[in-house]
Regions:
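Helix-rich catalytic cores of soluble enzyme domains
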Residues: 1-106, 122-136, 389
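Conserved, mostly hydrophobic/aromatic
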Residues: 63, 110, 138, 157, ...
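Short acidic/histidine-rich active-site segments
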Residues: 111-122, 148-155
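Intrinsic disorder at enzyme termini
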Residues: 113, 174-272
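A structural-propensity feature for long, helix-poor, extended segments
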Residues: 135-138, 142-160, 323, 334
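Long, amphipathic alpha-helical stalk/connector segments used for oligomerization, subunit docking
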Residues: 148-168, 173, 179-182, 186
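Generic long, charged, amphipathic alpha-helical segments
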Residues: 266-267, 274-329, 339-350
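Peripheral docking tails and interdomain loops at the edges
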Residues: 341-404
Length: 404
């Protein structure tokens, strides 16, 4: 989980590793049944609430299926959960409290024997007495106030969870068998088959985060623009994966984007400013301004609330001569068809260097807009990491040119 795997992989590889250990111990003359009775499994628990519940249920089901192949039908084992590293963030870190709470709830409803809840600041600080106390209080609240310890298997019979459990079990069993067919856990790991399979899932997750299809509050969605954060706390991005799987946060690549901004701020003692220049249709200009505020806030730039103008020409003149570093055109598609080209031409006649963006994707006129001087568009399908990286490069170039 903390290296970017999905729940199916987590279960399958855990069972593959178990079978490898059992076979090794059996070859050395040890009895299998006592091993099962002393078995302890700990898994990270992520933020996909219902799927994580199903994961622990599926694990127990498949564990008993494995034990039966060794002639063990009744045994006492323990399964514990630990709140994941993958789901935690450095920016807007108090959101980690909410993630840790829902993760603990998932694990408990999945019928684990214990849950370790990390402090919300564990990923970037030595946990403070306050953060440790809050982490401990989460389990106390779930037990004493929410009565999670009073009902046995409360999710039994819930259709969605039962279906998810069945599907995860089937897929995990198929993956488990495929690894065994390759010679088992040791061979698959030594040949880096497992690492490659995890890497494929990890890259897909990171891609979805960068496209904001996998939302993470405070990271790629709803960034806290009031937050002050030191560049030293932020990641420089993911390091190349080694043969040994290394736990990491999902947010590393986006943190690196924020770090670039914070380093620039420390160098020039000024935070780059984004201006949202709105005109035309009220509903669409507000919707696109809100989207732009959220999207560009990920960068760590100072994003001004939208400014509404009577016309595209007025908006272009005023925003071109303001002290902002980035301007975003916000309006409706019909308004873009009628006025966007005028906006870009007027803007560039007053300022040839400032970053100029458009919120939306008017494909019919996009070539003409870019030829006139539009830098880029931001829209629902934009890749936040790639787009902001390009904006940062031009902003840095413009600011440093002014210093010369």
């Amino acid at each position: 989980m903390d290296s970017g795997s999905n729940q199916v992989q987590e279960i399958a590889y855990t069972l593959n590793a178990l079978v490898f250990v059992l076979e090794q111990l059996s070859d050395r003359g040890m009895d299998i049944e006592p091993i099962f009775n002393h078995l302890h499994i700990e898994l990270a628990v992520g933020s996909e609430y219902f799927i994580e519940i199903a994961k622990f249920r599926a694990l127990n089901s498949l564990l008993h299926a494995v034990s039966k192949t060794y002639g063990v039908t009744d045994f006492k084992h323990t399964v514990t959960a630990k709140t994941s590293i993958w789901s935690k963030s450095v920016t807007d870190a108090h959101t980690n409290l909410l993630r840790a709470t829902t993760e603990a709830m998932s694990a408990i409803l999945g019928n684990v024997d214990g849950v370790l809840i990390d402090a919300y600041d564990n990923e970037f600080n030595a946990p403070s007495p306050f953060s440790k106390r809050i982490a401990g209080n989460i389990s106390t609240i779930l037990k004493e106030e929410s009565y999670f310890g009073k009902v046995a298997n409360p999710v039994d019979g819930a259709y969605y969870i039962e279906e998810a459990t069945t599907k995860i079990s089937e897929k995990a069993l198929a993956l488990f068998k495929s690894i065994e067919a390759l010679g088992g856990f040791y061979n698959a790991f030594e040949n880096e088959i497992i690492q490659q399979q995890i890497a494929e899932i990890r890259q897909e997750k990171i891609k979805r985060m960068s496209q904001r299809r996998l939302p993470m509050v405070g990271v790629n969605k709803y960034p806290n623009l009031m937050e002050k954060i030191s560049a030293t706390m932020l990641s420089e991005g993911a390091k190349p994966q080694t043969k040994v799987l290394v736990p990491r946060r999902a947010s590393l690549e986006i943190e690196a984007i924020r770090k670039t901004t914070e380093v620039l701020v420390e160098e020039i003692n000024k935070r780059p400013i984004v201006e949202l220049a709105s005109f035309g249709n009220l509903t669409m200009r507000k919707a696109r301004a809100a989207f732009s505020y959220d999207f560009l806030g990920v960068s760590g730039f100072e994003v001004w609330q939208e400014k509404n103008y009577e016309s595209a020409q007025t908006a272009a003149k005023v925003s071109a001569t303001s002290n902002s570093d980035v301007v975003v055109i916000c309006s409706s598609d019909p308004d873009y068809e009628a006025s966007a080209l005028t906006f870009v031409q007027t803007f560039r006649s007053h300022n040839s260097e400032k970053v100029l963006l458009l919120a939306g994707n008017p494909v019919n006129i996009l070539d003409a807009l870019k030829a006139a001087g539009l830098d880029d568009c931001i829209h629902m399908k934009s890749d936040v990491i790639q787009t902001i990286a390009k904006i940062q490069k031009k902003v840095q170039k413009n600011i440093k040119a002014l210093e010369v």
